[in-house]
Amino acid sequence: MIRFLFAAVFCVFALPAAAEVKIAEITSPGGIKAWLVEEHGIPFTALELRFRGGTSLDAPDKRGAVMLMAALLEEGADGLDSRGFAERREELAARIGFDADADAVTVSVQMLTENREEVVKLLKSALTNPRFDQDAIDRVKGQIQSIIQSHAASPDDIARETMDAALYGDHPYGSSDLGTAESAAALTRDDLLAARAATMARDRLYVSAVGDITGEELGKLLDGLLGDLPATGAPLPAPVTPAFPGGVTVVPFDTPQSVILFGQPGVPWKNPDYYPAYVLNQILGGGGFTARLMTEVREKRGLTYGVSTNLVNMDLADSWQGSLASSNDKAGEAVKVIRDVWVDVAAKGVTEAELEAAKTYMTGSYPLRFDGNDNIARILVGMQMDGFPIDYPAHRNDKIAAVTLEDVNRVARERMRPDRLTFTVVGHPVGLESTN
């Protein structure tokens, strides 16, 4: 019965809007810093840990090791094998999840107050003494091999991996987090231990907690949970400048629709142009059916069901990317229309009406992100990694509201680069050939 109560709490509990969230920074007796939002109305806490570096810390000849390691952390620890770990987690009505991406290894925990001490013990065993049993390694390797095979048959994944390789080259961002079939198959238990040592250290740790816990309680919890982790991990990779030469790369693939990815240089978080660019992106490709690209590519011409763009800000690279799918006989026209929109907005800018609609949506939708302990914990730990101040949620909408039409149109002129707009197309697009 307790696990069903937990599920109900997890699903329905929500905190106040962003501006009302009171965030405190605490430092444990052992020196571990964390951001905390106390909410004692429900006996439930979400804890988020993030270790900077992620799969980018794979050794060059061990690609896929960090991803495999993260997947195996819940497959047994100390005296519990894979089944025993899962059963104990179920008994405690806890959620413990591990994940990895190019920039971080993430640990997400949701727990009831009455079971918090035991959940932390279970989590600590996974972080400090994972078993990495060979049968679990073989089983998870098999799952990863299946995913790699499915990616090789997916036009979306082929497009993503082709574009990443072109943008980032030999940098870790340029290859799949999973590795290749060959590199994944060759990984050993020693490789997993090395990956854990490289990534899960206190010098790259960010922590947030939201819920029924005080600062004093959180400090003691963190020292007990994380105090035995290594002080330092492997050096982080150097930043990389994505290569956007302009032009088109076509990857022939038998599919009725061409998958199209496109992009150009981006804008870093901390650059003064970021907020005008953020609003400009909303107008260009982030605003659903009212966005310029949706209007021109879908509504006027029926070339796609949907097209979108995003500012992509990673730890070590920034870009501005978009995607769509179009039938092979229309893909060439879709690429042309996107280029034309890019040229037009760069030259002529956007309208006051477009600006106001974008700002209204962006400021109105922001509080909706703060809809539960776990989501807030993820937001807070992401803010720390990205270097935002602790009061950012209270002032973020002010930054959006302050963006003027002059700001947006200046950034459009200076930042939009039609000459560097680069396309990757997977399919058999009629009338479209590789130029790169």
Question: How would you describe each model-predicted region?
Answer:
Residues 14-18:
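N-terminal signal peptide c-region/cleavage motif recognized by signal peptidases
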Residues 84-233, 250, 276, 300-301, ...:
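Charge-rich, well-structured scaffold segments of protease-associated domains
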Residues 35-36, 43-46, 56-59, 270-271, ...:
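Short, solvent-exposed loop/turn elements at domain surfaces
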Residues 21-23, 48-113, 153, 288-303:
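M16/MPP (pitrilysin/insulinase) zinc-metallopeptidase core fold and M16-derived inactive scaffolds
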Residues 19-43:
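N- or domain-start disorder-to-order transition segments that initiate the globular core
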Residues 39, 48-50, 234-290:
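His/Glu-based metal-binding/catalytic segments typifying zinc-dependent metallopeptidases
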Residues 4-13:
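Sec-dependent N-terminal signal peptides
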